[in-house]
UniProtKB/Swiss-Prot annotation:
Cofactor(s) annotated in UniProt: Mg(2+)
GO terms of biological process kind: L-tryptophan biosynthetic process
Protein's name according to its UniProt entry: Anthranilate phosphoribosyltransferase
Species of provenance: Lachnoclostridium phytofermentans (strain ATCC 700394 / DSM 18823 / ISDg)
Family matches, as SUPFAM superfamilies: Nucleoside phosphorylase/phosphoribosyltransferase catalytic domain (SSF52418), Nucleoside phosphorylase/phosphoribosyltransferase N-terminal domain (SSF47648)
């Protein structure tokens, strides 16, 4: 099927949902050669991925991952990467605040790809055991409303793609698929993207993948996060409908900063930044976490405004609930 699909793509023809899903199945099963995988990814990128092609590919990738079993609504806070901004780990830090606010967070991540420090890197530097089996992570999720799923543990089939992606050295559909293939089947999601043109299409993809409440965001300073230094373009998913709007820090009483104020560093440096924020240290980095946490809380709850959600996020940090959440997570991940 992958050869036929390449022929279609070279002729600028869109693939059907069924064909795109079958191709992903071939790739994830190890049935496609590196040459064919590279040709397919390049041809798809040159044509431009459709909503159906992305959705089908994500569904195909999910079929081949190890699942984390649970019985609750869970939130994923994630970015596609590729913004080349080298910010500190905003999404990961935000996860501790949001989960401490009572919203279960199932974070899915990897080591660094497009930055100096990925989610797995900073958590490891904080002392978290990232190598837990799915059953152990499920227990922690049940116990404290938070877990981390290391991509290499859950997506072993990616070994068939990794060498090709490294050699190609260009963005491919897999830059988008990682955040869409949460092993816990997250039905709540804040997804940051690396270009504005992806906001609406990926909101439609999340809707097709069964996300109940979600938000796709792009900071106009280039960040794949809700930005504290510029406007953020948003598309919100609620009750099967999409809503477009713009977010600005001033809406919740925060002051814009320079993009450089959010830059991080090595895993050890970013771990220190995360711990300082959760301990109550003030400044732009804390405000960026409050902004992103407020958006998550507001997105999930029906009974509050964005401003009230920001107050909740601030109180969670100032009351030390967020730092206690981090310390408890470290403790539970290392228990034997």
């Amino acid at each position: 099927m992958i050869k036929e699909a390449i022929y279609q793509l070279v002729n600028k023809e869109d693939l059907s949902y069924e064909v795109a899903e079958q191709v992903m199945d071939e790739i994830m099963s190890g049935e496609a050669s590196n040459v064919l995988i590279g040709s397919y990814l390049t041809a798809l990128r040159m044509k431009g991925e459709t909503i159906d092609e992305i959705t089908a590919s994500a569904a195909g990738m999910r079929k081949h991952c190890v699942r984390l079993l649970h019985n609750m609504d869970v939130l994923e806070i994630v970015g596609t990467g590729g913004d080349e901004a080298n910010t500190f780990n905003i999404s990961t830090t935000t996860g501790f605040v949001v989960s401490a606010a009572g919203i279960p967070v199932a974070k899915h991540g990897n080591r660094c790809v497009s930055s100096k420090c990925g989610a797995a890197d900073v958590l490891e530097a904080l002392g978290v055991n990232i190598m837990l089996a799915p059953l152990e992570s499920a227990k922690i999720l049940e116990e404290m409303g938070l877990c981390f799923m290391f991509a290499q543990t859950y997506h072993s089939a990616m070994k068939f793609v990794a060498p090709v992606r490294r050699e190609l050295g260009i963005r491919t559909i897999f830059n988008i698929l990682g955040p869409l293939a949460n092993p816990a089947g997250a039905n709540l999601e804040l997804l940051g993207v690396y270009e504005e043109a992806l906001v609406k299409p990926l909101a439609r993809v999340l809707l097709k993948l069964g996300v109940k409440r979600g938000m796709v965001v792009y900071g106009r300073d280039g960040l794949d996060e809700i930005s504290l230094s510029h406007q953020t373009v948003c598309c919100k998913i609620r009750d099967g409908k999409l809503y477009d709007y713009i977010l600005e820090p001033e809406q919740i009483g925060l002051t814009k900063c320079k993009k450089e104020d959010l830059v991080g560093g090595s895993p050890a440096e970013n771990a220190a930044i995360t711990r300082a924020i959760l301990n109550g240290e003030k400044g732009p980095k804390r405000d960026a976490v409050i902004f992103n946490a407020a958006a998550c809380i507001y997105m999930v709850r029906d009974d509050i405004t964005l401003q009230e959600a920001a107050k909740i996020a601030t109180d969670i940090i100032d009351s030390k609930k967020a730092i206690h959440q981090l310390d408890k997570f470290i403790e539970l991940s290392n228990r034997r």
